Amino acid sequence: MIIDADYITEDGKPIIRIFKKEKGEFKVEYDRTFRPYIYALLKDDSAIDEVKKITAERHGKIVRITEVEKVQKKFLGRPIEVWKLYLEHPQDVPAIREKIREHPAVVDIFEYDIPFAKRYLIDKGLTPMEGNEELTFLAVDIETLYHEGEEFGKGPIIMISYADEEGAKVITWKSIDLPYVEVVSSEREMIKRLVKVIREKDPDVIITYNGDNFDFPYLLKRAEKLGIKLPLGRDNSEPKMQRMGDSLAVEIKGRIHFDLFPVIRRTINLPTYTLEAVYEAIFGKSKEKVYAHEIAEAWETGKGLERVAKYSMEDAKVTFELGKEFFPMEAQLARLVGQPVWDVSRSSTGNLVEWFLLRKAYERNELAPNKPDEREYERRLRESYEGGYVKEPEKGLWEGIVSLDFRSLYPSIIITHNVSPDTLNRENCKEYDVAPQVGHRFCKDFPGFIPSLLGNLLEERQKIKKRMKESKDPVEKKLLDYRQRAIKILANSYYGYYGYAKARWYCKECAESVTAWGRQYIDLVRRELESRGFKVLYIDTDGLYATIPGAKHEEIKEKALKFVEYINSKLPGLLELEYEGFYARGFFVTKKKYALIDEEGKIVTRGLEIVRRDWSEIAKETQAKVLEAILKHGNVDEAVKIVKEVTEKLSKYEIPPEKLVIYEQITRPLSEYKAIGPHVAVAKRLAAKGVKVKPGMVIGYIVLRGDGPISKRAIAIEEFDPKKHKYDAEYYIENQVLPAVERILRAFGYRKEDLKYQKTKQVGLGAWLKF
């Protein structure tokens, strides 16, 4: 099983290294024969002798083309003859490529920006993570001492925790009497002990949570200050930091550094990404949070160190559990796109699609288009096109709602209509599909590059799902599930990739044709439904909600199922409408904002944001009760009464302060904030009192009654004293409770002023409801 690949230089020549796990043993394979190359398209082949003479300089050494070879390729499906230009060293490519491109005889150069080791994996058909080797995992986490204003890495590391299948341990340099704590003499010895642990346990995968931007950069900084090395790589090298967009990325040679943070950010949508919040979201278990100022206080006073050690140990344990949960999926994505987990776990879906396409292009002898230069990128960003069809929702409370949607609408359109850059407006074509409204023509004489790949992916996914149903082995079932989910992620990213401004196979005409066909098919479904007595309540891109006013639930379900069967007989190719589900009651506020309740009493919401972290508990609770009154009891007047009661209790200071706390996360160093919001103001006041405030910390505050801006009246929850302080009732009514429910109740004709507690009685609008 290939874990990773890179190259080293020996006597000026590159040597590919393949890091592998074979029969339980780690090994490195070397290849000294692979050479870097690029392709050049010439105006006239006779100019090749001139091109061969082009030289450049790198670190005082002359860079030259060592060999040339004329090759037959395809470019967007059309035959093309190009020259393959070999160079001595991968770093020669960036040194000489512009000189080659600028030569008068050169039309353009291609595939000059594919990293050497990745190029090797593609050309040799090697796939990381293929095989049944059992990898070993170790999670690592650090705790540091930090005071506001200090530069990164100034304060010592006070604890290092690690966890694997055998359990979790903590290394520290202050005396703590706990069975899982190992005490050493100094920070220096603690870091050296970590190195020893990693070398002894020799894990294939090191799991961290934000290790790219915190744990490893901090460890490297402290090791440097203490004059010690951090040889964590299997080749005894230190972790290597590199820039990746706005972030850092840390590589450990011979091991996979699996940082959960970018993976979880890409995979799940949460209001906050603290380790505690993620653990609760994934496993439904809570984990105690010990705040930075508490850690600092415990370390400096010696009181409460056991609690900090337990917290540190749990950090490593939780990171290990999360790592084991998320790693298999990333391993399957790595297998699918043919690049190492280290890269895949830090990639956007657009980049995953691109690596997959680069590999398949090589297999099919296709020359990959170039990435856009700055000017072309800016031009693409300015381009726009019409998206999916969204129908404004029908207002009111509705009963007996069916949900129908297309299965993989955009991938199905791409395959059915052969939507691809190489089939677009193709000359000498016998059969075309013409996109509605936009008029782009796609040749049907041959399968397009991307539609054929997408078709293979969807076919493979169906086979895997069939095997899952047949399999009785739970382990095999789980692995197959990871595989089919990885395919789904990739398949669903192709439409977005066509419109991704940095894409090699960018195709605005393809993207707008896909959405045009999407609008046509969903509108066809709408018209056919309405002709059969259904009322369509809401449409969004690939799905819709409908009912038959006055009909019984069973009749609506039966007619919907028959309709799905009928419409699928009319739809072309892979297009298929599915009966998604049935809801007893529901309402639609605006586009992408609705709430429904199924027949089991489960409430489903979209876009109503009852989990945002900067909403207080009272706002979330009120919204939940309002939804329950409307959906479970079908009573909007009851919902209005709930809101009035809450606003009355707030006005009379009858709501407990713990329900008023607003949480917001510090996302960067305090000195970098230009706009001072309430959470930043509170954080700055805490820092002035010696509390360690760092990016990622969540600040909880309550807004007090008084004059002046909110930022001056916000107080940390720890400092709130109900005997001394009064919360700002008007602020919580106007900025928390009413915004949480107003958009819901506006859909039933209520205005903001109708929802507040008033001494005079309001007339209800319940008669306005539709049943």
From Swiss-Prot:
SMART domains: POLBc. It comes from Pyrococcus abyssi (strain GE5 / Orsay). One of its GO terms (molecular function) is DNA-directed DNA polymerase activity. One of its GO terms (biological process) is DNA-templated DNA replication. CDD domains: DNA_polB_Kod1_like_exo, POLBc_B3. This is DNA polymerase 1. It is an enzyme of class 2 (transferase). Pfam families: DNA_pol_B (PF00136), DNA_pol_B_exo1 (PF03104). Its EC number is 2.7.7.7. PROSITE patterns: DNA_POLYMERASE_B. The keyword Chaperone does not apply. NCBIfam families: pol2 (TIGR00592). It catalyses: DNA(n) + a 2'-deoxyribonucleoside 5'-triphosphate = DNA(n+1) + diphosphate.
